[in-house]
C-alpha cells in the first residue's frame, strides 16, 4: 500500500453546521477585506497581462472565472479539512510571467505549460520533496527574477501620470493617505479606496467606454486544448513552479506559522498542483497559497475559528467568478491609465520586498545578474528571459560567489576558535 506524505489534520474536518457555529461578524469583516484586496489590484494585473499578450475579452473572462470560481472550491475543501485559513487563488508573479511569453508563444502552448507545472507540483506534493525543491535555488535569485518581471508595473504606474494625470494622481494620493493612516486603512483598504476614487475620476472626465452590447453577463468559461512545446516547457514551467512554491506558498506558509498555525505543506502543494491542472484548462495561471489574503484573515480573532473567514473569502470569490464577464467588461471599459495605476499601486510593496530580499544578504551578484537578464527581456533559443535570469543568476553565484562565502565561513570559524 502506497502511503501518501500528507499531513494528518489535528482535528476532524469541520462540517457545514460547525462552520456556521464558528462563524461571526468579525470573521466576515476580515473575509470581506481580504476578498476586496484579491479582486482589485491582482485582477488589474490579469487585465494588464491579458492586454499585453493580446488575449480576447473571452479569454480574460475565462481566466478570472478559473482564478476565483474554481479556486474557491479548493479553498473551501482545504480549509474545512484542516480547519485553518488556507485560501488558494492564483500566482500573481506567474500571471506577470505569462505576459512576455504570449508575445512569442501561442496561448495553447502557455496553457500546456500551466498543466505541466500543475503535474510537477502534484508530484512534489505526493512525494514529499517540496522542501528540497524550495531550497534548490537561493532565495535572492528567485526574488531578483520576481523584481525583474514586476518592474514594468512600477514603470507603467509612473507613465500613467503622463497619460492621464487626473486619474493617476487622485488614485495615488488616496492610496498614500490610506496607507499612512493604518486605522482607516484597516476599514477601507488602500487599493479599494484608490479604485473607488479612480472610478469617480473616470466618470467625471467622461472617459468610460462601455463595450457595444450588454454589460452584464454570467460566466461561460472556455475549455482550451493545450499544446506542449519544449520552448514553453523551458520558459515557463520552472519559473512558474518556483514562483508558486518559493514566492507564493513560501510566503503564505511563513505568515500562517507566524500567526500560530501549522499549515500542511505537502497537502497544500498537491492541492495547488491539482488546482493548476483544473484551472489551467480554462486558461488560468497556476494555483497557489495566497500570502496577503491569508495574512489579513489570520491576523485577528481566535485561531481555531479563522478558517471560517477563508471559507467566506472562497464563497465571495465563487460569486465574483460566476459573474466574471461582467467584471471583465467593466474593467476593460476603463482607460489604460486606470488599470496601470491600480496594478502599479498593488505591486509597490511586492517590488519593495523583492528588492530587499534580493540584495540584503548573500548571492547579491547572482541576484543582480538575474535581475538584469530578466529586465532585458531578450529571449534566447526562443525561451523567455525569466528562465535565463534564473540560469545565469545561479551560475554567477555558483562560480563567483561560492569562494567568497566559503572564505567568510572559514574566517568566522577561525575567529570563534581563537576566542
Regions found by a protein language model. Name each.
Residues 1-30, 210-223, 399-419:
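Intrinsically disordered, low-complexity non-transmembrane regions of multi-pass membrane transporters
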Residues 3-25, 48-74, 238-307:
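Membrane-embedded helical hairpins/re-entrant loop segments and their flanking transmembrane helices
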Residues 25-42, 168, 189-190, 203-205, ...:
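Hydrophobic, membrane-embedded alpha-helices of multi-pass small-molecule transporters
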Residues 34-36, 74-86, 182, 274-285, ...:
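Transmembrane alpha-helix interface/packing and boundary motifs in multi-pass membrane proteins
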Residues 41-45, 87-95, 249-250, 284-294, ...:
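Transmembrane helix boundary and interhelical junction motifs in multipass membrane proteins
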Residues 58-60, 66-67, 74-130:
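Membrane helical hairpin/interfacial module
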Residues 97-103, 178-179, 293-309, 313, ...:
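Interfacial segments of multi-pass membrane proteins
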Residues 103-209, 312-411:
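Membrane-embedded alpha-helical modules
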Amino acid at each position: 500500500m502506497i502511503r501518501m506524505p500528507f499531513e494528518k489534520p489535528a482535528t476532524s474536518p469541520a462540517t457545514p453546521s460547525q462552520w456556521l457555529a464558528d462563524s461571526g461578524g468579525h470573521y466576515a469583516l476580515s473575509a470581506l477585506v481580504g476578498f476586496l484586496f484579491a479582486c482589485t489590484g491582482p485582477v488589474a494585473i490579469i487585465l494588464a497581462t491579458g492586454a499585453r499578450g493580446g488575449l480576447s475579452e473571452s479569454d480574460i473572462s475565462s481566466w478570472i472565472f478559473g482564478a476565483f470560481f474554481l479556486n474557491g472550491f479548493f479553498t473551501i475543501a482545504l480549509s474545512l479539512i484542516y480547519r485553518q485559513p488556507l485560501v488558494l487563488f492564483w500566482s500573481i508573479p506567474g500571471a506577470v510571467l505569462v505576459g512576455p511569453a504570449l508575445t512569442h508563444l501561442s496561448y495553447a502552448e502557455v496553457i500546456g505549460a500551466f498543466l505541466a507545472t500543475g503535474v510537477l507540483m502534484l508530484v512534489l506534493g505526493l512525494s514529499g520533496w517540496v522542501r528540497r525543491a524550495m531550497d534548490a535555488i537561493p532565495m535572492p535569485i528567485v526574488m531578483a527574477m520576481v523584481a525583474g518581471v514586476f518592474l514594468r508595473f512600477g514603470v507603467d504606474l509612473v507613465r500613467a501620470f503622463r497619460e492621464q494625470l487626473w486619474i493617476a494622481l487622485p488614485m495615488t494620493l488616496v492610496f498614500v493617505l490610506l496607507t499612512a493612516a493604518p486605522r482607516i486603512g484597516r476599514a477601507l483598504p488602500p487599493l479599494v479606496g484608490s479604485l473607488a476614487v479612480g472610478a469617480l475620476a473616470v466618470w467625471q472626465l467622461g472617459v468610460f467606454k462601455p463595450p457595444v452590447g450588454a454589460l452584464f453577463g454570467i460566466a461561460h468559461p472556455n475549455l482550451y486544448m493545450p499544446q506542449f512545446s519544449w520552448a514553453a516547457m523551458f520558459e515557463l514551467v520552472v519559473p512558474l513552479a518556483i514562483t508558486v512554491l518559493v514566492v507564493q506558498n513560501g510566503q503564505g506558509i511563513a505568515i500562517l506559522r507566524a500567526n500560530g498555525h501549522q499549515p500542511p505543506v505537502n497537502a497544500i502543494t498537491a492541492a495547488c498542483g491539482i488546482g493548476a491542472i483544473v484551472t489551467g484548462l480554462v486558461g488560468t495561471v497556476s494555483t497557489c497559497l495566497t500570502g496577503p489574503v491569508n495574512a489579513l484573515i489570520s491576523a485577528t480573532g481566535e485561531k481555531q475559528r479563522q478558517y471560517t473567514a477563508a471559507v467566506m473569502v472562497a464563497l465571495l470569490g465563487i460569486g465574483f467568478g460566476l459573474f466574471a464577464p461582467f467584471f471583465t467588461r467593466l474593467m476593460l471599459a476603463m482607460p489604460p491609465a486606470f488599470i496601470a495605476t491600480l496594478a502599479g499601486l498593488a505591486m509597490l510593496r511586492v517590488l519593495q520586498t523583492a528588492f530587499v530580499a534580493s540584495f540584503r544578504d548573500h548571492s547579491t551578484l547572482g541576484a543582480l545578474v538575474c535581475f538584469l537578464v530578466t529586465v532585458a527581456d531578450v529571449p534566447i533559443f526562443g525561451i523567455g528571459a525569466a528562465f535565463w535570469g534564473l540560469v545565469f543568476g545561479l551560475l554567477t553565484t555558483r562560480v563567483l560567489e561560492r569562494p567568497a562565502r566559503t572564505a567568510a565561513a572559514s574566517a568566522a570559524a577561525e575567529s570563534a576558535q581563537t576566542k
